[in-house]
Amino acid sequence: MKIHVVVLSALVSWAPFVVAQEPAAAPDQESVQNVGPVRVFLDCRTRCDFDFIRQEIPYVAWVRDRQDAQVHLLITRQQTGAGGRENTLAFIGLQDMASVSDTLLQVSSPTDTDSEEREKLTRTIALGLIPYVARTPQAAGLDVSWTEPTEFELEAVEESDPWNSWIFRLRTSGSLGGEERTKDYSISTSVSANRTTEDVKTEIWTYGRYAESSFELSDGSTTTGLRRDYGASLLQVWSLGDHWSIGGETSAGHSLYGNYDLRAWIAPALEFSVWPYIEATRRQLTFLYALGVQHSDYIEMTIFGETQETRPAHSLFAGLSMNEPWGNATVGLEAFQYLHDPERHRLELFGRMNVRLFRGLDFNVSGHFARVKDQINLRAGEATDEEILLRQRELGTDFRYGFSFGLSYRFGSIFNNAVNPRFEALD
C-alpha cells in the first residue's frame, strides 16, 4: 500500500499555514540508511489526538520514551490574535538522525472544528517527518504531491479584512442542580473584543456572575450562600522591539465576596523579555513593572474604618517558562505594595515542573506560597460560622499555600503504534 502525503497550498486561507523557521539539514552522503521505520517520540504539550495521529501516519514507529527515539517531536501552542491556535512543531533529531532538525508552524482558524484542527496538525506532522522517512526503506512507499489552489481560493486570500483584525466573543452559561435538601444555580456571561497584531494588542473584557446555593439544616432552617461579581477591563500593549513592550491596564468591578461595591484600578506598565518574544513557545523570561492608583468603595466598613479610599500602588512580576526535551517548567514571582503604607504588601511565588528523570520515570511538582499583608478591604467584625463555611466573605490571613507532586514509571514494550478503541467506556 502506498502512503500519500498531500501538501495543500499555503495560499488556501482555511488550510494550515506552515512556515519552516529553521531549514532542515540536507541529507549527507555519510548518512546511514535505517533498516526499519523511523522511531518517533511524540511529546505534545497541548491538545493532540494521539490515536488519530498514529492511524494516519503508520509508516513510522511511535515509541513511548525519548531514549528509544530517533526523532523527538515537541509540540507547543499559543493563541493567535484572531482567536485561533498556532502550534510550534520542533523536530529534534536523535541518535543517527541527530544532524536533522527542523521547526514548523501550523496555524488553525478560530472557526475550525476539532476534526479540522487535528487533520491540519497531523498533516503538518507528516510534512515534518519526510526528511527522516526519506532516509529509511519506508521512503520507497512514500509519494509527495501538491494540490494547486483554485481561482476562488486565491481570491479569498487576497480579500481585505473588513473587521480590521478585531475579534468579538459573546459567552453565557448557566447551571442548575440539587437534591432533597440542597439546591444551587448559577449564571455567568462575558463579552470581549480583542485586536492583536505584531505591534499592538488590545483586549476589552466585561463579565458578570451570579451564584446561589441553599441548604436545609437539621433544625428545619435554611442557609443560603450568595456570590455576585461583575466588571470590565481594558488592556493596551505596544511593541518596542524584540525585547520591550509598553502599555497599561484599567479595570473596574464589583465583588460581594471581596467587600467591593466598586473597585477601580489604572496602571501604566513596562515589560522586558530576556529572550526575543518570538521564542515564547519554547522559552520566556520576562519582567513587568506597573505603577498605578486604586480607588475602592466598600460595601461595609473595613477593619481600618474606611468606607472608601484611593491609594497608589505598584507591582513587579518576574516569570520564567520553558518547554524543552527534558520537560517543562514555569516559575513566577509577584510583588504588590501600597505606597501609602509599605507594610501593606503581598509577595507570591508559584511554579510547576514536569521532568523526565530517566527512561520511563516522570516527575511532576507544583506549588505556590504567598505572604499576604495587603487586605485593606476586609470587613470589620467577626465572620459567622455560616460565612466561613459558605465562603461568603474574604477572611484575614497572613499566608496562602498549596503543594502537589506526582511520580509515574512506565516499562515494557517501547512501541506504541496500535490503536484499539473497544470498551473505552470501561477503560
Feature locations, PLM:
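Short loop/turn motifs that connect adjacent beta-strands in outer-membrane beta-barrel proteins
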Residues: 158-165, 198-201, 239-243, 258, ...
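Transmembrane beta-strands of outer-membrane beta-barrel proteins
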Residues: 166-170, 202-204, 246-250, 266, ...
